[in-house]
Structure formats: C-alpha cells, structure tokens
Amino acid sequence: MRTNPTTSSPVVSTLEEKNLGRIAQIIGPVLDVVFPPGKMPNIYNALVVKGRDTVQINVTCEVQQLLGNNRVRAVAMSATDGLMRGMEVIDTGAPLSVPVGGATLGRIFNVLGEPVDNLGPVDTRTTSPIHRSAPAFIQLDTKFSIFETGIKVVDLLAPYRRGGKIGLFGGAGVGKTVLIMELINNIAKAHGGVSVFGGVGERTREGNDLYMEMKESGVINEKNIAESKVALVYGQMNEPPGARMRVGLTALTMAEYFRDVNEQDVLLFIDNIFRFVQAGSEVSALLGRMPSAVGYQPTLSTEMGSLQERITSTKEGSITSIQAVYVPADDLTDPAPATTFAHLDATTVLSRVLAAKGIYPAVDPLDSTSTMLQPRIVGEEHYETAQRVKQTSQRYKELQDIIAILGLDELSEEDRLTVARARKIERFLSQPFFVAEVFTGSPGKYVGLGETIRGFQLILSGELDGLPEQAFYLVGNIDEATAKAMNLEVESKLKK
C-alpha cells in the first residue's frame, strides 16, 4: 500500500526551528544558497526566500544540486526580481506539497498549489508532495481494457487504453479544446470519474478561454463548485522555467490522490508535454549540465520517464493521460517528441482538412493509431470492422485525384460504390458533442462501443446504400441516421 498524503502542509513555523541559509549567487531563475555546516537540505526540498525588513518577498525554490562547500543550487518557482545576495533562505525540510482531494475540483491552481482564481482559499488539510516514486510492480493492473469514451471515431479506430497515455496532435483551431472538454464531460457521466488539467507552458489567453468554456458548458459548476468535474493547474508561458518544469507534477499529484485514495478513474490532460521538456532544457545549462543533442538536457529521458511512469493503472483505479504534443518545425525526429512517442499507447491526430469540411471531431481515421487495436484485445468483430473502415477510407483517398480530374462517372461500378460508402463513413464518424450544445443547438450524443460497431457494419454491408449521405452527418447511433433519412425524404416530398 502506498503512503497516504500528509494531512498538514510543511508550513514555515518559526525561523528558529528551521535551517537558515543565505543567497550567495543569483543567475536568472537559479539561486546558489549557503547553509551552515551539517545543516544541508535534501535534494527536492522546498526553500523559501523571505524579504528583508518591510519588503514583501516570498519566493519558493526547489533544491536541484548539492555543490559542496555547504552550497546548494536551487531553481525558483516564481520570478526572482528583487532578490539580493545575503537574503535569508528557510529550508522547509520537505518537498513542495499541494492540496489534493475534492477541494481542488472547479478551482485553478499554480505550481505551488495556491488558488489563482480569486475564489478564496482552498481547504489544505490534505496535501501531498509532488515528488513520489511510481507505483510498485505488484500494485499495477496489467489487464488490457478499453477506456470507452463514447466518441465513435476514437472508440472504433484508435481506442484508448484504461490507464494508458494518448498523444493528441493538431494545429491551432482544429478542435483540440472541444475534444478535451467532451472527454472530461464523458468520463464524469459514464465512468463517475474526474479530470485534472495541467496547462504546461501554453498561452495565458488559452488557459482563460478554456476556463470560461468549461464554465459555459457546465464542466465547472459555478453555482455548486463541489459538483465540478475538473481541477485546473496552470503554469503558463510567462512563468519562470522552474514553474513550467514542475506544474505537470503538481497536476499529476492531484490525479494520483483521486486514483489511490478515492479509487476513481481519472483523466489527466497535459497541454503541452513539449513545454515540460523545454522548461527543463532552459534551466539545464544554468545548473551546469553539458547539453546533449539539439541543445536538450542530458537528463531528458530520465525527466520524461519519472513523469510518465507515475501515469498508470493500479488495482485501486486508473490515470488515463491525454497529452497534447507540439512537434517543433514538424520534425518528428526531434529528441523531445521522439522521447514522448516511446511512452504513448495511442495517437489521436486532428486533421485541418476534415475540420474545413465541417466534420467534427476532426480526427483523422487513417493517421490515428492505437496499440489496443488487436483482435486478441478488442475482439475479432471490432478489429475486422475497424480494418474495413480504414480500407474503404484509404481507397476513397486514392481515388480523389481521379475524381477531381475525370469525375465520378469515369470510375468502375465497384469504385463508385466504395466512394459512396466512404462518404457515408466519413460523415458517420462525425458526432454532436454535449459541450458544443450551446453553440450548435443539437443535443450531444454518447455512443456505446457496441452501437458504434453495429452502425459501421451496416454501412459496410451495403444495407444502407439507398440512404442519402447527409443523413449520416452529426448523428449518434445508426438508428438516428435512418430516422434522419426518413425525415429528409418527407421534407423533400413536401417541397415538391
């Protein structure tokens, strides 16, 4: 059994009880601190710099290196403006600890676990240190089980693993945020789970927009904050690298509590995992490490591993992680995305071409992949249906150039049938979302995996060849598509 979180945070009580050091050097976000002999803090201990006299300064740092000669090197979690050599530094005697549990839901926190949403203080009776070891082998749940999202294209073609890690690839404006919000909504409704969102080094405006959209869609319940389905932890682009480097761990620590103590299924969103690596590379040289390939930190794999290995299923519950991955200059061989890929179980690729056609969620059925899509895991029926959907979509893609030049009439009868079915499949992969109801006016749909498979089998078998393709656009299950086709027929007769 893992140790429970502490029920009191390491508060700096009186100066006499704590180790006191003094700042010896400041280089940007990195501080060197001298402590008395024999009173050195441990690696990862939190240090607090207090201002002199009337100056209100309260900067928290984290010990990264013990340099010898009673000096330690620490990374600041907030701006070091106004700090001077000789200032007193207090060793708290423990790592950074953050509030965990139900009190975190519906609130926004910074890397230190302090609320930043102007909604008053948070109950901090239960806190947990952000540095913990990954669960032991004996605690892991190694069964392969599908994490049903209720989103047709995901469940059929690139299913998520319960306790797995999913990479979310997509440019600006293709629907990443809406997809993330729908997943948060569906895990709460279908799995009774909660979500934690870690905003790592992204734009402050985007963080604010996400918060506002979550309030609009009901994911954050303003009237009764305790009924919210998500906790938000932000370390945005304007924060020092120390905060961006640790904010992912703060979010993960909150998620671990829901998994280990509340025994819930948790969704952990990290947006963006690349910024976590980038923040580490910013301080790496200041910490005196030799850079490795492309200037990244030599500890890149270790840092990534220590975060990713804590994201897993245990016998108590699961943390399923969805990580937005920025690919610098679209170079997939760059060490940062390449290291991330090694940890992913599935990839969900969002396509601008599909978004332009108005097909939402704009998940690319051919580029998205999953290690779960194997007959021994998902079953023969699911696997066969998914493969046939992909084959039909691939054939349609190959024929598009011919159609553009010569037109549909020049295709063989068989190819014309394939194109017609592929267009129905493309539209049936779209789906109305609960969180988009306020914008679209059409009620959201949660489609179970069995219903999804049945629908695509009917399209592939040719039973629905007589229905118009627009009947399949933005519907839930296949019965809704047939009902919509009948309505369209009635409408067209009335017009005549």
UniProtKB/Swiss-Prot annotation:
GO terms for molecular function: ATP binding; ATP hydrolysis activity; proton-transporting ATP synthase activity, rotational mechanism. It is found in: Plastid, Chloroplast thylakoid membrane. SMART domains: AAA (SM00382). SUPFAM superfamilies: C-terminal domain of alpha and beta subunits of F1 ATP synthase (SSF47917), N-terminal domain of alpha and beta subunits of F1 ATP synthase (SSF50615), P-loop containing nucleoside triphosphate hydrolases (SSF52540). It is a peripheral membrane protein. It catalyses: ATP + H2O + 4 H(+)(in) = ADP + phosphate + 5 H(+)(out). Keywords: ATP synthesis, ATP-binding, CF(1), Chloroplast, Hydrogen ion transport, Ion transport, Membrane, Nucleotide-binding, Plastid, Thylakoid, Translocase, Transport. It is an enzyme of class 7 (translocase). It holds the Pfam family ATP-synt_ab_N. Its EC number is 7.1.2.2. GO terms for cellular component: chloroplast thylakoid membrane; mitochondrion; proton-transporting ATP synthase complex. The keyword Thylakoid applies. GO terms for biological process: proton motive force-driven mitochondrial ATP synthesis. ATP binds at G170, G171, A172, G173, V174, G175, K176, T177. Transmembrane segments: none annotated. Produces ATP from ADP in the presence of a proton gradient across the membrane. The catalytic sites are hosted primarily by the beta subunits. PANTHER family: ATP SYNTHASE (PTHR15184), ATP SYNTHASE SUBUNIT BETA, MITOCHONDRIAL (PTHR15184:SF71). F-type ATPases have 2 components, CF(1) - the catalytic core - and CF(0) - the membrane proton channel. CF(1) has five subunits: alpha(3), beta(3), gamma(1), delta(1), epsilon(1). CF(0) has four main subunits: a(1), b(1), b'(1) and c(9-12). Belongs to the ATPase alpha/beta chains family. This is ATP synthase subunit beta, chloroplastic. It comes from Trachycarpus fortunei (Chinese windmill palm). The lineage of its organism: Eukaryota, Viridiplantae, Streptophyta, Embryophyta, Tracheophyta. The gene is atpB.
